[in-house]
């Protein structure tokens, strides 16, 4: 990343990208984060039909009605934490390599670096959401197009995850501990509103991933889901702004 000191604009962004690619394939932990969605998707595609048949045969229980919840728990919400954690570890690598210090004396402002990081997180999250849920074999037909905007809102939640990790962690060991701590908050609690039929489920809106999950559930039920996208985008952006100011103060 020393080459960044003489770069600005698009060339700096290209340098960031090359550094991310090198950093990812050299670190087994980051490689595992990249391929984890493939493993989860395979598990959902292979095991869900088996459990559906077994529960229907033995207990007369229809698991099909819970497919949106399964997709949310194993693919949508995990895409958020995987993309956010991957980006956080790459930033922590940059901190260890002195990149953040070098940025202070280059034409590249910290906002450009963060803008690149946030954009890549949103793109990666959206790709994960669309690809994994489409390949799961249990997604209701006709919902693929709705996964793109839902994936973008999930991407904003992944940016929140990135910034939460960086707000506490100063190295990858601390970052890994933060990922574990955030696991239930991101991939567990947002599933609980599924079981709450009243408007009290909106209380879970304090959790950034809730909005993408709720939008997907409503879309699966053929309801009006766009208000949850708008609300989720506004809420997540507000949190991103607050956390980014802390990030900027920490590394300015």
From Swiss-Prot:
Membrane topology label: Multi-pass membrane protein
Subcellular location, principal: membrane
One GO cellular component term: plasma membrane
GO biological process terms held by the UniProt record: response to antibiotic; transmembrane transport
GO MF annotations in UniProt: efflux transmembrane transporter activity
Subcellular location: Cell membrane
Source taxon at top rank: Bacteria
Residues passing through the membrane, by range: 31-51, 69-89, 119-139, 148-168, 176-196, 224-244
Alphabetized UniProt keyword annotations: Antibiotic resistance, Cell membrane, Membrane, Transmembrane, Transmembrane helix, Transport
Subunit structure: The complex is composed of 2 ATP-binding proteins (Rv2688c) and 2 transmembrane proteins (Rv2686c and Rv2687c).
Function: Part of the ABC transporter complex Rv2686c/Rv2687c/Rv2688c involved in fluoroquinolones export. Confers resistance to ciprofloxacin and, to a lesser extent, norfloxacin, moxifloxacin and sparfloxacin. Probably responsible for the translocation of the substrate across the membrane.
Name the record gives this protein: Fluoroquinolones export permease protein Rv2686c
Organism: Mycobacterium tuberculosis (strain ATCC 25618 / H37Rv)
